[in-house]
């Protein structure tokens, strides 16, 4: 860590030509012009002080002189008057030379202005020293701010920065100043606001004001921001004398909020002392901090705030910020109550909430949503961002003025979790920005038992925010008024600039990680200090009593009033008989379900379309709907091929997707497709965004030109992130059931970078939080000799997490069996072998009366496979998604002659049919495709097995035996046939890697599995 004083040597003050655009201290911008000063435009070698940073300072002086010549030193007045009179470079502070031959009058005039030979160099150096001093405070002052309420550590972990960085003579000497200069008056640059209405101050007062602005209980990190207007805005907020003032009414409100925050935790501790609740003790100021951000944002027009936070203090936020009924919170502590809703539920400090109420400060309606989250710290960050983006989209809030997000973090997780970085880098991307998030870090200076010095390599836990130029406000949480001021500024920053901002609440944790944990094992000295520490409520109450803002009886009455509220709610909680998880829903869908949360029907209409619609979409997909738009020659051939397919009434994979999307847009369903390179498609098959070859950045999205009143289509290339982007899209899909939200992995192999979102949100989300989600994952999958990282979407992992029982045969005679299966499952897993079926499953996702995540293993080689085509006939009215595609060749005509029935899924079907034809076994081997793997199509497969009574059964897959679908399909297929026959395996041997990287080995393995599949004697020895 550099010392504050050493940084000044590297400073380069901002030039006046830059500052003219922004804040000046009550100086008219119109007067600030530099056209007449010759030292600004002429070569500067002749003026020894007009070089480097000196020239910048001279411009500052010139600005001041233009407004008021008496505001600068007399020597400067002479210099500028001489220069304006036309003195050549190098002579403005001496007797001026003749301007031209014969111009004696001009010479006489210029010479009369020179009254003295000032020591200009010394004067400039002194003023530059003061300017460097001011800038040093602005850059490094936060390092010596009094941030730690315990007084143990500097919040930035750097104990080597001396607290008396300026006041001693040797420190002043670094700047070329000494104690004799302390009472000298110096003109202030336009890059500071410490002067208020004054343009010059004594050095002693300059230092005092800088200390007050930057070295007390607030530390401001902002000088890395590369926007001058934003820097000036922040300087004005923190440097202006007396700006941090609160009315008595505001102080009383702050005290009341602290009472609620503190007494809530104390009440829980009294009633349930042995329960984990991850209390807020040590950072009780978080509650008034959040309420201040919400109040200020509401005042600025925000009417919907979406929040995400970890477990620490969550119950307090639910109770005192979102205003969840206290009895509902207290019920969660009753171990005797049973859950009324299906699913596992979740612990109380993970639950979300949605509530609409009146903001009492602004008297405006505001909706607050706290997103449910797992214990995986920071995982909810992109989810909150995605939900915020969706809510902004649906209400037409293109600038983020109505809907905003607040994210809470712990210090250790904020520094340690990579998803924080991924989320920050979404913050300013056009298709992902939420126009500014307020981040609040509960910096209790410990991560469970880990010291901050072992938890991060950076000075602050917030340093990650610097990558997006977000200002960072560090504040001592034991100074509630400083916290409130910082939160007001943060809300104003977001409202003004629509960019991220970070509030770092430097606090402590009074108890262990949870209430049952003993922190003295690992932090004995820290906790000895904490035991002595007065609670912030007591400190602030004593301060207000001493100021006469409140008296002791009023304070005690506030406490007793809230205690009574808690006791009454506790009594009501005893009347509750069951726990309702649905009371904790964070994203309700009004009107989609019945009042009791059930689907309005248990059926799905046909997903087919009329030929007119198919043809119209196909024609648009094969053309450029914009005039004077030049596309690439290769793309012209692709569009021509599409047009020929439409004429022939067939579709390939890309065209089937186009038709599914286009038809849903016609029905008012917004579609959002996101992922790496999805606009073109990793395999150059999609081309949903056309690029003009002659005009840079000119693009066209034909999908948005289909129908007059269609829903908008959003297709957006994402950043190179899986975890963050999938979380974002999951959050987007939470907001409304009437949108098809898809995330496509570049290759299915890369989805495991987002495994946390899949495991903690998508798979169990409904079971834990009674929250449905219709997100679609497109995962390119197929063994094609491309190596172990470009072959497998790991279907075995998705199938292993399906919630059906492989050993129980459901009631196949149940009405709407297939729809009931879908309703009961936790997600749907499909592997389509035809474009038509892909078309149907996308449309079914929206036409179902409920929402489930959809996992689709999409093809790669089939995108251009000549046999992977579907006729319009497969997509017309009356057609549906086929869960199973049965054999329809000669084997199906004479089923009694079939020796083997092969079950498979996906691309391997085309390898099998080719091999079967080559071996002339089309009548002996039947091939049935399972298109929907989960929920398992027991009913249809039973019919297939019964159709071929003499056939032995085998499962064929191109994946290795310990991967793919075999371990999922075999027990369910055995259950289907009551274990009457064995189910043999034809496929690759077990392996650690998903695929070989050697092409020859790949082909050898493929031929071996085909030999196994069609050798009718191979399983006889195992019988």
From Swiss-Prot:
Role played: 2-oxoglutarate dehydrogenase (E1o) component of the 2-oxoglutarate dehydrogenase complex (OGDHC). Participates in the first step, rate limiting for the overall conversion of 2-oxoglutarate to succinyl-CoA and CO(2) catalyzed by the whole OGDHC. Catalyzes the irreversible decarboxylation of 2-oxoglutarate (alpha-ketoglutarate) via the thiamine diphosphate (ThDP) cofactor and subsequent transfer of the decarboxylated acyl intermediate on an oxidized dihydrolipoyl group that is covalently amidated to the E2 enzyme (dihydrolipoyllysine-residue succinyltransferase or DLST).
Subcellular location: Mitochondrion; Nucleus
GO biological process assignments: 2-oxoglutarate metabolic process; generation of precursor metabolites and energy; glycolytic process; succinyl-CoA metabolic process; tricarboxylic acid cycle
Assembly: Homodimer. The 2-oxoglutarate dehydrogenase complex is composed of OGDH (2-oxoglutarate dehydrogenase; E1), DLST (dihydrolipoamide succinyltransferase; E2), DLD (dihydrolipoamide dehydrogenase; E3) and the assembly factor KGD4. It contains multiple copies of the three enzymatic components (E1, E2 and E3). In the nucleus, the 2-oxoglutarate dehydrogenase complex associates with KAT2A. Interacts with ABHD11; this interaction maintains the functional lipoylation of the 2-oxoglutarate dehydrogenase complex.
Keywords, alphabetical: Acetylation, Calcium, Glycolysis, Isopeptide bond, Magnesium, Metal-binding, Mitochondrion, Nucleus, Oxidoreductase, Phosphoprotein, Thiamine pyrophosphate, Transit peptide, Ubl conjugation
Activity regulation text: Calcium ions and ADP stimulate, whereas ATP and NADH reduce catalytic activity.
N6-succinyllysine: residues bearing it: 74, 564
Binding positions (thiamine diphosphate): 312, 411, 444, 446, 676
UniProt protein name: 2-oxoglutarate dehydrogenase complex component E1
GO MF annotation terms: metal ion binding; oxoglutarate dehydrogenase (succinyl-transferring) activity; thiamine pyrophosphate binding
């Amino acid at each position: 860590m550099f010392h504050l004083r050493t940084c000044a040597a590297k400073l380069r003050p901002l030039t006046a030509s830059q500052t003219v655009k922004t804040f000046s201290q009550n100086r008219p911008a119109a007067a600030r012009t530099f056209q007449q000063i010759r030292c600004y435009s002429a070569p500067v070698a002749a003026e020894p002080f007009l070089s480097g940073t000196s020239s910048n300072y001279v411009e500052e002086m010139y600005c001041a002189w233009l407004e008021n010549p008496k505001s600068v030193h007399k020597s400067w007045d002479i210099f500028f008057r001489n220069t304006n009179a036309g003195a050549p470079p190098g002579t403005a502070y001496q007797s001026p030379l003749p301007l031209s031959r014969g111009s004696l009058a001009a010479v006489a005039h210029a010479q009369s202005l020179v009254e003295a030979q000032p020591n200009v160099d010394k004067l400039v150096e002194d003023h530059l020293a003061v300017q460097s001093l001011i800038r040093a405070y602005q850059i490094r002052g936060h390092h010596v701010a009094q941030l730690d309420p315990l007084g143990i550590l500097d919040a930035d972990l750097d104990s080597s920065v001396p607290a008396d960085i300026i006041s001693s003579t040797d420190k002043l000497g670094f700047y070329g100043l000494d104690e004799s200069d302390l009472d000298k008056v110096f003109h202030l640059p336009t890059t500071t606001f410490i002067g208020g209405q004054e343009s010059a101050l004594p050095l002693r007062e300059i230092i005092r004001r800088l200390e007050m602005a930057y070295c007390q209980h607030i530390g401001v990190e902002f000088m890395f921001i590369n926007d001058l207007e934003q820097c000036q805005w922040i300087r004005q907020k923190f440097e202006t004398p007396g700006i941090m003032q609160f009315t008595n009414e505001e102080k009383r409100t702050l005290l009341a909020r602290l009472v609620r925050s503190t007494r809530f935790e104390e009440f829980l501790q009294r009633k349930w002392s042995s329960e984990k609740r991850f209390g807020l003790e040590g950072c009780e100021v978080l509650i008034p901090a959040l309420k201040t951000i919400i109040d200020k944002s509401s005042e600025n027009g925000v009417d919907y705030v979406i929040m995400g936070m970890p477990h620490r203090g969550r119950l307090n936020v639910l109770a005192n910020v979102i205003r969840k009924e206290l009895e509902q919170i207290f019920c969660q502590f009753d171990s005797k109550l049973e859950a009324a809703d299906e699913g596992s539920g979740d612990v109380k400090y993970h639950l979300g909430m949605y509530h609409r109420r009146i903001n009492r400060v602004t008297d405006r309606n505001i909706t607050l949503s706290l997103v449910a989250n797992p214990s995986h710290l920071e995982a909810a960050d992109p989810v909150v961002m995605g939900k915020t983006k969706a809510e902004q989209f649906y209400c037409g809030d293109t600038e983020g003025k109505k809907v905003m997000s607040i994210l809470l973090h712990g210090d250790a997780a904020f520094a340690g979790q990579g998803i924080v970085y991924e989320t920050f880098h979404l913050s300013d991307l056009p298709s992902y920005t939420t126009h500014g998030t307020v981040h609040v870090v509960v910096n209790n200076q410990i991560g469970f038992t880990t010291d901050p010095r072992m938890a991060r390599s950076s000075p602050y836990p917030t340093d990650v925010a610097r990558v997006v130029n977000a200002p960072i406000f560090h504040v001592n949480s034991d100074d509630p008024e400083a916290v409130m001021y910082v939160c007001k500024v943060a809300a104003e920053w977001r409202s003004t600039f629509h960019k991220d901002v970070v509030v770092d609440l430097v606090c402590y944790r009074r108890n262990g990680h949870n209430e049952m944990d003993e922190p003295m094992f690992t932090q004995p000295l820290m906790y000895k200090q904490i035991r002595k520490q007065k609670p912030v409520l007591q400190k602030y109450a004593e301060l207000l009593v001493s100021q006469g803002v409140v008296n002791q009886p009023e304070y005690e009455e506030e406490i007793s009033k809230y205690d009574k509220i808690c006791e009454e709610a506790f009594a009501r909680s005893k009347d509750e008989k069951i726990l309702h998880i649905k009371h904790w829903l964070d994203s309700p869908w009004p009107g989609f379900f019945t009042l009791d949360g059930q689907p309005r029907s248990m059926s799905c209409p046909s997903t087919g379309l009329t030929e007119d619609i198919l043809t119209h979409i196909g024609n648009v997909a094969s053309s450029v709907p914009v005039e004077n738009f030049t596309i690439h020659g290769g793309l012209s051939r692709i569009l021509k091929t599409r047009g020929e397919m439409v004429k022939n009434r067939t579709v390939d994979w890309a065209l089937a997707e186009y038709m599914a999307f286009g038809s849903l847009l016609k029905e008012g369903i917004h579609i959002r497709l996101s992922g790496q390179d999805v606009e073109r498609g990793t395999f150059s098959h999609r081309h949903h965004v056309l690029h003009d070859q002659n005009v840079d950045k000119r693009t066209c999205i034909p999908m948005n030109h289909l129908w007059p009143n269609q829903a908008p289509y959003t297709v957006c290339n994402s950043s190179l992130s899986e975890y963050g982007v999938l979380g974002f899209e999951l959050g987007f899909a939470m907001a409304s059931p009437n949108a098809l939200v898809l995330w496509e992995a570049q290759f299915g192999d890369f989805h495991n970078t987002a495994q946390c979102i899949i495991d903690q949100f998508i798979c169990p989300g409904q079971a834990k939080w009674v929250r449905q989600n219709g997100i679609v994952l497109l995962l390119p999958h197929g063994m094609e000799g491309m190596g172990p990282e470009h072959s497998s979407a790991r279907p075995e992992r998705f199938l292993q997490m399906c919630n059906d029982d492989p050993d129980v045969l459901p009631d196949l005679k149940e009405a709407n069996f297939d729809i009931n299966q879908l309703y009961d499952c936790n997600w749907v897993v499909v592997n389509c072998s035809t474009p038509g079926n892909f078309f149907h499953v996308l449309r079914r996702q929206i036409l179902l009366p409920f929402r489930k995540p959809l996992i689709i293993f999409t093809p790669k080689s089939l995108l251009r496979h000549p046999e992977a085509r579907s006729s319009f006939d497969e997509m017309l009215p009356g057609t549906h998604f086929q869960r199973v595609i049965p054999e329809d060749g000669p084997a199906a005509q004479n089923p009694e002659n079939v020796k083997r029935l092969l079950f498979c899924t996906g691309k391997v079907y085309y390898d099998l049919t080719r091999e079967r034809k080559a071996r002339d076994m089309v009548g002996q081997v039947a091939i049935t495709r399972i298109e929907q793997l989960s929920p398992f199509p027991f009913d249809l497969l039973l019919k297939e097995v019964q159709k071929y009574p003499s056939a032995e059964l085998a499962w064929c897959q191109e994946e290795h035996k310990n991967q793919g679908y075999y371990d999922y399909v075999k027990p369910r297929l055995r259950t289907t046939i009551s274990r009457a026959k064995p189910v043999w395996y034809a496929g690759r041997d077990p392996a650690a890697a998903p695929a070989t990287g050697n092409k020859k080995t790949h082909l050898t393995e493929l031929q071996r599995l085909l030999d196994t599949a069609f050798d009718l004697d191979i399983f006889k020895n195992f019988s």
